[in-house]
Amino acid sequence: MNNAFVIVDLDDFLTGEGRTRQIQIVKQAIEKRCFVRVRGHGFTHEGIDYAYEVVRRVFALGVEVLNKYVVPGNQVGYIGFGKEKADGAIYPDRKEFWQVYQPDQAETQTAKFYNIWPTDEVPEFEGVALDLFYRLQRVTQAMLRLTALAIGLPEEHFAEGTVGGSSIARIIHYPPVPDGAVGIRSEKHTDINHGTGLLTSQGGGLQLLDHSTGEWLPVEHDYDHIVFNWADMIQAATNGQVPSVMHRVVNPDDPELRSKPRFSIVFFLHPREEIVLEESSDIVKDNGPLTAHMFLWLRLWQIWLSDTRPAWYTGPDRAPQAIAV
């Protein structure tokens, strides 16, 4: 098995043919701590190309226009270049992005967010972004069902808890990298959520850490596969049985590639905020329970997408904000 990824066929899993084999493949991927390339995702080549065409038009609007769509809280709308910094990194990431929040939020959710769109400038964006959201949600929820079965739990153990959850589609623009630039496009990190789905990106640079050797391995993209990885919430919820996967996006070595932008479309599948990840946590006052809502806002504070340190948190302070890139 390739150390960077395995291949899962959702059609085989969802139709029942080869179901046992797909569960076994996911079990191997969990043990190997690698990425999964998912076939049978339902996207067409033409649909992917059109989505990226619309995305390019959004970011071509420029910062002055995009700043009209900044929303306090950084969960929806436009988040500017250099805003996010990986926990422990020296420099912020060299990216800007647009976030699309779960349209079907649970009634129990206390922190509600409502999407905002550049309707006057790129009216097609809303429809494209919501279509991406729902398609990627379907794929990542299917992967959570496979994950549960792979570790001996009921099929809906994780997936049911994501219905109406705090999931986000993030549409990212990595601008060209000028000579002498500091920082990389996305510093090494693990994702916050349960599981992440990545549509084929326009531009390379994604790398996975091989935890057995310490080597960074390139992750290739193509139209026929969505890249999936497990993240920190499912690691917490399984007491480490399903570990999150460290990854990064590096700057190109080739000067010609450095002069070109990179675009990617990522989906972060989150549970509902009341879902308990740990019954007793040593980072919570009095070793109280750690919920998905608490975990999310702690991590957002740690990566500088929230200004408020959680009152319940007993761990160390976050690293200082880096100088601008």
Regions from the PLM with identified roles:
Residues 1-325:
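Peripheral, non-catalytic segments flanking oxidoreductase cores
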